[in-house]
Amino acid sequence: MSDNLKLRPYKSTDAETIVSWIKDERALRKWSSDRYGDYPITAEDINHKYLDCNGDCEEPDNFYPMTLVDEGGPVGHLILRYTDEAKSIIRFGFVIVDDSKRGRGYGKKMLQMAIRYAFDMLKAEKITLGVFENNPSAYYCYKAAGFRELSTGKSFMIEILGEQWKCIELEVKREC
């Protein structure tokens, strides 16, 4: 893994690279659930969602798409968005790493950097995310970065590609 990793704000030019990491519809759905329509998606689809929909947030300054870069360019991506009016809870979403770099610590590092950003810069008290049970590599990456299953064991089912997928809720809280 590169020592020169930086988490920076998303640029519209990142979308082409992100789209190239999504190799099939199953990968798209694991990444985005039902948030996008038909497969394949385009760079314009991502940019439209980020600019026009503002990440399903109702107020400005609630949505933070970020890109992990090394000396060669983008290697990972995720979004951060507030889920409450008090701006104390951040939800991570659209978490993805360049498929050629998976299993090498990039995802864990990106999440750790994003956690630090959410706590230190955005002043969050808690960060949440959802992961599909059929995506064990992502689940274990999130756990390695510090996320834990909710004590309530909260999860829900969603129909994707004609199947019932279980989504497990994870969180990490600010340490006192």
Protein language model regions, located:
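Extreme N-terminal starter segment of soluble prokaryotic enzymes
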Residues: 3-5
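Conserved glycine-rich acetyl-CoA-binding loop
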Residues: 94, 98-112, 133-140, 144
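Acetyl-CoA-dependent GNAT
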Residues: 9-15, 20-102, 111, 117, ...
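Residue-level detector of high-confidence beta-strand sites
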Residues: 77, 150-152
